[in-house]
UniProtKB/Swiss-Prot annotation:
InterPro entries: C-N_Hydrolase (IPR003010), C-N_Hydrolase_sf (IPR036526), Nit1/2_C-N_Hydrolase (IPR045254), UPF0012_CS (IPR001110)
CDD domains the record matches: nit
GO molecular function: omega-amidase activity
Domain called CN hydrolase: residue spans: 53-299
EC number per UniProt: 3.5.-.-
Annotated gene: nit2
Top-level division of the source organism's lineage: Eukaryota
Record SUPFAM superfamilies: Carbon-nitrogen hydrolase (SSF56317)
Keyword annotations from UniProtKB, A to Z: Hydrolase
Family: Belongs to the carbon-nitrogen hydrolase superfamily. NIT1/NIT2 family.
Protein name, per record: Nitrilase homolog 2
Taxonomic source organism: Dictyostelium discoideum (Social amoeba)
PROSITE patterns: CN_HYDROLASE (PS50263), UPF0012 (PS01227)
A Gene Ontology biological process term: oxaloacetate metabolic process
Active site: 92, 163, 204
Amino acid sequence: MYRGLINSFKNTSKFSTSLFNNNNNCSTTTKSFTHISQQLRKVHLMADKEKVFKFAGIQLLCGDNKEENVQNAIKHIDEAAKNGAKLISLPECFNSPYSTSTFEKYSETEDGETVKKLSEAAKRNQIFLVGGSIPEIDKATGKIYNTCFIFNDKGEVVKKHRKIHLFDIDVPNKIRFKESETLTPGDSFSVVDIGYCKIGVAICYDIRFPELAMLYSKMGAKFLIYPGAFNMVTGPAHWELLQRGRAVDNQVFVAAISPARNPSSTYQAWGHSTIVNSWGTILATTDEHQSIIYSDIDLNTLNETRSSIPIYSQKRDDLYKLDSIKKQ
């Protein structure tokens, strides 16, 4: 794209240099440089445009029927893609109830029907897909994980993120939930290059650990995506706060995509899926109902944030350091 313009610029420069030796040709020289300047401006505008893409977060209503849950997800993926989204995320546990008593019943292997359907949707729509999460059972070990499958625009699984930090909490008189009663924690990082930029994927409770977000940023991720299902206690208190905190801490985009609230479910999701930019500004959000949120992800604004407040060049590596023990 750039080579032809660069060669044109070189040729015109040589031509113009000779013209400078002839005062009668100054006007011709000026016109030549004006033309090249206009062409280079077009290149810069095209480059900037390439740094902008549309993201969609799908807040799905999830029930007890796995097949209906998956069909609902596919329908909304198709809708989001039709509306121009190039990167789409589903919520945590979108194909099953969020309950330790049902994870085993709803679990699938990585070549199961849910993954196949998501793969087909990503390929058909030519989009990158962060596949929320599903209960995944490992064929070899029989262990169950809370897993997010990530697909490229050819429908290929390019990464799977197994939830690293299991949601084990006990808030007196409010809520008790222990994923570790059924699930096994993952032990790997999930950073994927989608062409526009690198994204880092983690699940729900993972967002409470700033070290993970910092490591993802260190690995080059400029957009962190968290399929999550905060509840009616932690949601109002921390959902938005944590997203804006991770965004500002690392000067990245952050999206947290929740299931819609199901009044008949034993676990009540907070909803309020949200997209935040690198300045901590909310770009899009919603309420507790099923919906799709959209936002243009403009990487130019991220670069502006980092230029204005250059925390990366101001870190004191002589005093402290963050590194991963296990490499990606």
